[in-house]
């Protein structure tokens, strides 16, 4: 439990036994939040003498001479953050699958390779991550932002493809930097949106990230946006010192993929049969393909690059597809059947 504006003020840590239900966690957190709120409200009246042990402890967490106004605001700014150690370690291990590719893409785009640590904040490098506002994939693109750089429809959703999404993220970050002129604001814009960041910059100045962090009160500039760049710096620090924080951890190895660009449309089942793999294997390594393809109402589109681990096929993809014959290919996509 901590103050949402002054992150140095950590009121306490609550240990939850393994298996504690969500409802019980919420009950215990709410109970402690209410108790802390009462203490802060009491201190905000100016009380500084005859303090209880809890009042003295809470007051000692704030700088000497803290104002009643600050304490009054703090009573309404108590935030709970669940521990992330296990999730971060899992994401760190997963990052090895795509890290080299991301860094190479970012170099080509003139984006600092350190920004490859950003998915630790966004998704813990989980390609199946979905947010409550509809953001998707390791880079957590929303549909509206993603469509600027990727294909997103009922056939393909490239947000869920780590390669396409990483390339798109590099382009978005490079564009944000071209407008803001500095990386703290370009990275903040990745979360908050460029228009909101530009409003803050007009109010406080182009290079006033610290002022914006402390004092900007835009309507949608909440905790996540305000602290997004700081969270990135923290994630980068842990990423760069992973052996210290996670002794014995190992990065996942990048998969050695065989790839093939389709010259025509094809049903997922026909492609799986031709390659000698299951549709489940095909789906696991081609995450942009939507459910309409696996259900058979749409073909895998012409021009799509298909990936499979080299170990999953016993010949080159070109050879396997050439030997499958012409009957499996189609010149057109299946028509929509919406009602």
Each PLM stretch: what is its role?
Residues 53-101, 108-109, 148, 152-179, ...:
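Extracytoplasmic and endomembrane cell-envelope/extracellular-matrix remodeling and assembly machinery
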Residues 129-149, 206:
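Short, surface-exposed glycine/acidic/tryptophan-bearing loops
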Residues 1-72:
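Extreme N-terminal leader/anchor segments
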Residues 112-113, 143, 279:
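Alpha-helix N-capping/helix-start residues
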Residues 103, 107, 112-115, 126:
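Auxiliary, metal-adjacent structural segments of Zn-dependent hydrolase domains
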Residues 112-119, 136, 183-188:
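Alpha-helical scaffolds flanking conserved acidic
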